Amino acid sequence: METRSLYVHIPFCESICSYCDFCKVYYDQKQSDLYLQRLNEELSQIKQHHLKTIYIGGGTPSALNDEQLEKLMSMLKPYSLEVEEYCMEVNPESMDYYKLKILKKGGINRLSIGVQTFQDHLLKEIDRHH
């Protein structure tokens, strides 16, 4: 059997970093709700559920609110049953205890924490907040 992976792009950010070249837009609840609806429609077309990895990147996937994160985890559940690595990018500023619980319950077993620097003056220079 072929090794397969799934990348899910969540393009929403609470702020736009000057150095980032990835496809992103400012977080908007209505837009992100619609995006998740369309993502669910696309996922329903995937026949292959034997995935080795799932990677949720962005943008800032952790910019989604609790309800949206729960919906995302629910949508991906059928694809995550045999996954070895289930990763999501997060920004320290947009994470909290409840979001971590949602991700753990959803099966996430690896976080990619977007810490660019711990030095405040450098954060300011690159328009980064956390």
What feature does the model see in each segment?
Residues 1-7, 22, 48-50:
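N-terminal [4Fe-4S]-dependent radical SAM core
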Residues 2, 18-20, 82-84:
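Residue-level signal for beta-strand positions within conserved beta-sheet cores that form or flank
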Residues 8-10, 115:
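Alpha/beta-hydrolase
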Residues 11-24:
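Local cysteine-cluster metal-coordination motifs and their immediate loop/turn environment
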